[in-house]
Amino acid sequence: MSEVLTIDTTSGVVTEEILEQLRLFGENHPMLSVAIPEYKEPLPNPTMKNLVARLKMTMKLYNGVGLSANQCGIMQRVFVIGTEHFQIACINPKVVAQSEEISKDNEGCLSFPAMFLKVDRPTWVDVEFYDETGAFKQIRLDGLTARCFLHELDHMNGVKFIDHAGPLAIQMARQRQGKLVKQLVRINKNAKKMGNKK
């Protein structure tokens, strides 16, 4: 749970809002395979503002760099990308141009814990979207930011990152995932034992 203070600069009114973390759904949730329709409500609005704040908070809690609403069981065409200190919300996101040059790099996904796959993506993309204030944005993204945008846009279109990989790559990634999960469980058990000794 997180507390957010909002100050209306025209009236000077301060409002307090308690935000609850969103529930994150795993890879087999059917909503991850559904294309999300365009968001039609006028912006800004309190419902979208609250959803974006909760997406940002949840992404930060899971140490992610991107999170889409449908990963949390919410059928809204919005995602957030960014780091701990800077996040942007993308409502009705679109790619309007992309590089011919392709880059292959590792990607993970909060809905696929401890799983990583090499995925081909354009090195840059020109994108359009609305932020939670209703401002229309047209920007060029490159590198990791472009990769995150495209990964989350795939979620909006019902595409999972494993859909970009072949069966052998997925099998190898599953094996690495299993080993990593076992290591994390072992580390967690050892940490609990150490905590109980104090």
Predicted ranges, named:
Residues 1-198:
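Positively charged
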